[in-house]
Design a protein with these regions (language model features):
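Conserved ATP-dependent adenylate/AMP-binding module captured primarily in the ANL superfamily
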Residues: 49-79, 163-181, 211-225, 298
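ANL superfamily adenylate-forming
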Residues: 72-134, 240-294
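Conserved AMP-binding/adenylate-forming
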Residues: 3-52
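Conserved AMP-binding/adenylation subdomain of ANL enzymes
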Residues: 161-179, 186-292, 303, 328
Length: 349
């Protein structure tokens, strides 16, 4: 609530568009949900966006207040502010950012939060929350703009609420005992909607700030949940195959035999709801507790319960490999305009 109260005290109005230009940080979520409580509209901008792309979205969405992450985002945003009269205020998440000596209007997020730490700031937010409607605009999701000018898709709270309801019905196994790794950028509707659902279900969110560090982060966090795009799993597949191919003959034989067993068990029997032969089931259970368990421990995925994958086609070879080694992916399809998920495969079948 403190972020929402700070927004009200700062003068951010009902259904006012605000920008969030940052890599994944916890402050992004504070800002998003503070905006929702304040009935403002947070608009995510890719952390790698150029000043020209930022300028376009700021003008197109009539953004007056822009939250920025680290030094790169601040530098770009300040350049845009100098040529965009409508962009009046920058709020900086990272206190290590060095402001331009000519910057007289930007403030750090820590200072911004203090604005909400007074009794007067609480009242308007309570009124706004009481007046909130599912018809309120929740966010505008802009495309990356790599092939043309970015286009903004309008999503209302009703879109998110319906998404929560249907995912709750389809994924009852997601509970407050889970931990989800936030890896995809929160500017991507897949991650944004997935995080919203996880918070709705009481899931703990672990945020991976630097995409290049994900291989180090996963073994530290051991997530049970993580949504991702096929490219991530393609890299996992290639890496594992290289390790197997460069292993001594006996180890290579053990891994290849286990993968063959897993493929037969999962794809030919389990996924078709056919009871496997006892010998196959025993062999699979042994491989699952030894070979596959070791592989998943190395990857940091040994606690994995559900790994949704979407955003692009997933090749059959990668899909079959992941199912063979018992990594619980759930392949689906979605769009920004549909608040991500349109459909996804069941766990079995």
């Amino acid at each position: 609530m403190l972020t929402a109260e700070a927004m009200a005290e700062f003068g951010i109005g009902v259904q006012e568009n605000i920008g969030v230009y940052s890599q994944n940080m916890r402050e992004c979520l504070y800002t998003d949900f503070g905006a929702y409580a304040n009935r403002a509209v947070p608009i995510p901008l890719y952390a790698t966006s150029s000043p020209a792309q930022i300028e376009y979205i700021v003008k197109d969405a009539d953004i007056h207040t822009l939250f920025v992450g680290e030094q790169l985002q601040y530098n770009n945003a300040f350049k845009v502010q100098q040529i965009t009269p409508g962009l009046t205020r920058l709020i900086i998440f990272d206190s290590a950012v060095k402001m331009n000596p000519e910057d007289k209007t930007s403030i750090y997020f820590d200072y911004f939060l203090r604005l909400g730490n007074n009794a007067q700031a609480e009242a308007p937010v309570k009124v706004r929350m009481k007046e909130a409607s599912e018809d309120d605009l929740a966010t505008i999701m802009y495309t990356s703009g790599t092939t043309a000018e970015p286009k903004g898709g309008l999503l209302h709270h009703s879109n998110f609420m319906q998404s929560m309801r249907i995912h709750e019905a389809r994924l009852p196994e997601v509970t407050d005992k889970d931990t989800s790794m936030c890896f995809l950028p929160l500017t991507h509707i897949f991650e944004k909607a997935w995080v919203a659902f996880c918070i709705y279900r009481g899931v703990k969110i672990a945020i991976n700030k630097d995409p290049k560090m994900i291989q180090q982060t996963l073994p530290e966090i051991h997530p049970t949940l993580m949504c991702n795009v096929p490219r991530f799993w393609e890299k996992v597949y290639v890496g594992v195959q290289e390790k197997i191919n460069n292993s001594p003959g006996l180890i290579k034989s053990i891994f290849n035999d286990a993968i063959k067993t897993g493929r037969l068990y999962n794809l030919e029997y389990k996924n078709k709801s056919i009871t496997p032969p006892l010998s196959l089931e025993l062999k699979f259970n042994f491989d699952n507790k030894t070979v596959f368990a070791m592989l998943k421990r190395v990857l940091g995925l040994e606690r994995g319960k559900l790994f949704p994958v979407a955003g692009a086609p997933l090749s059959d070879s990668v899909n079959e490999f992941l199912q063979s080694v018992n990594i619980p992916i759930r392949y689906g399809y979605g769009l920004s305009e549909t608040t991500a998920t349109v459909c996804f495969f069941p766990a079995i079948g």
